[in-house]
Amino acid sequence: MKLVILLVVVSAMLVLGGAQTASQFYCGDFLARTMSILCWPDMPKRSGSQYAGYGWPWLPPFSSSRGKRGIVDECCYRPCTTDVLKLYCDKQITI
C-alpha cells in the first residue's frame, strides 16, 4: 500500500513539474496577456480606450532585445517556455 502511494505521489510530481516547462506557442493576444502576467503580475488591467489615440506613426521603433530575433520569432513561430518569455520582461519587446 505504501508503495502505491509513493508511486502516485512521484507520478503527480512528474506530471506537474513537466507542465511548467512544456513548450507552447504564444501569439497575438495570448502572448501579450502571458507577458503581462509574467512581467507585471501586480499591475491592474487597463481599458483599451486609454490607447485609442496611439497608433503606428506615433510609436517609437523598438531596438532588438535579443539580437535579430524577437519574441515573436522565438515564441510564436516556434514553441517556447515561460522561462524564455521571462527573458524579455526587462527589455523592450521587438515584434
UniProtKB/Swiss-Prot annotation:
This is Bombyxin C-2. PROSITE patterns: INSULIN. Belongs to the insulin family. The keyword Plastid does not apply. Silk worm has two kinds of PTTH: 4K-PTTH and 22K-PTTH; there are many forms of 4K-PTTH. Residues 1-19 form the signal peptide. Keywords: Cleavage on pair of basic residues, Disulfide bond, Hormone, Pyrrolidone carboxylic acid, Secreted, Signal.
